[in-house]
Amino acid sequence: MILLHHLRVGRSIFCVWQLEELGLDYELKVYHRNPETFRAPPELKQVHPLGKSPVIEDGDIKLAESSAITTYLLERYDSEHRFWPQRKEIAAWAEFTQWLHYPEGSVFVPLI
């Protein structure tokens, strides 16, 4: 079963959404931000050296960063390509990749 380390008020909500859409069984480990600093709790550093969320554990694979997790989950669990185009459809795949990385590069930076 997949374990998702989920930080309240963060990007890991997109991973929860994806796990639900894919119909995968998963466990959600919820962490809360420090109310004064709004930083992640120190115990997240025990999960991953970056000390941030999201992080998934799937067997012996441990992976951080929401777009990396999205790509991994699609590659591993969506072989029918219900939610993303095949790489041989290069134009559609390139557009998908653009939108996959758009939030990190363009949306969230101005919001911080």
Write out the residue ranges for each language-model feature.
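GST-like domain detector, emphasizing the conserved glutathione-binding G-site
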Residues: M1-I112
